[in-house]
Amino acid sequence: MAKRPVLEDVLDDEIDNMDMDIAQFDPSLRTPIAPVQPGPQITRSQDQEPPLFPNFPHPEQDKSVERKDIVDPNKFSAEERAELKKFQIIYPCYFDKSRSHKDGRRVSESKAVSNPLAKTISDACRHYNLPVMLELDKTHPQDFGNPGRVRVLIKDNNKNGMPVDSRFKTKRAVLNIIADYLKTHPTTLASIGPKSGIPLPSEYETGFEPGEIPKVKGFKMNTIVPVHSELTIKHPMTKSIYDPEPEQPQVKAPQAPKQPKKKVMKIRG
């Protein structure tokens, strides 16, 4: 007898820790990262002493992320991978004012903002000297058009689970200070441009001007997204999706010859 399908409850924490990539849903997607998807990239901010990952670059606190600050997670040692599991995951949709808690928002509505980006969340953690990693290729399943997430170390298991910073003892406290930072650093088109600190794809290095994207009815989505988002209409691989279909010349069907009218003779009696 065939097995019946089984429904399984999935907790929010399980969703938060999923390694989600939009290209996994449909390998035929015409996006900047699919079907030829680049390897995952992680940028790392300044860490406290002693460094948790000695092989990582250590940029100065106020400097933007540069190419030399991007590391390949596939080169992590076993010890570094173990340390990475101690980090808490934070997604941009946690701060999206257009979302309800059911849709993924994790802060109060008064603290939420428009168009939150993972890069700005990473900047907030850097600002407060929290150990943080920016994963550009990871995506929340409810926010697939806004790629990027942050891993931040809040409690150190090597120190009996003590907070890394006594000012922020819980994840809730960290979310609130990030929300405050996002309020004072609103997302603009410059946030995704060449001066954002995120290296642009080669096709964007010259002549690229960031622009807002149109909202799709029924979707909770940013109007400003990272350039490697599948929703970026400027990319040559996705622009054709938004282009109108070319009009096909209409071919008139040949007309059948008119039938001669039948003559009817009426005879009066």
Swiss-Prot record:
GO cellular component terms, A-Z: signal recognition particle, endoplasmic reticulum targeting
This protein's UniProt keywords: Cytoplasm, Ribonucleoprotein, RNA-binding, Signal recognition particle
GO molecular function, one term: 7S RNA binding
Organism for this UniProt entry: Debaryomyces hansenii (strain ATCC 36239 / CBS 767 / BCRC 21394 / JCM 1990 / NBRC 0083 / IGC 2968)
Tree of life domain: Eukaryota
Basic residues composition bias: residue spans: 259-269
Low complexity composition bias: residue spans: 248-258
Record PANTHER family: SIGNAL RECOGNITION PARTICLE 19 KD PROTEIN, SIGNAL RECOGNITION PARTICLE 19 KDA PROTEIN
GO BP terms in the entry: SRP-dependent cotranslational protein targeting to membrane, signal sequence recognition
Ranges for region Disordered: 30-65, 236-269
InterPro entries cross-referenced by the UniProt entry: Signal_recog_particle_SRP19, SRP19-like_sf
Name of this protein: Signal recognition particle SEC65 subunit
Residue ranges of coiled coil: none
Task of the protein: Signal-recognition-particle assembly has a crucial role in targeting secretory proteins to the rough endoplasmic reticulum membrane. It must be involved intimately in the translocation of a wide variety of protein substrates.
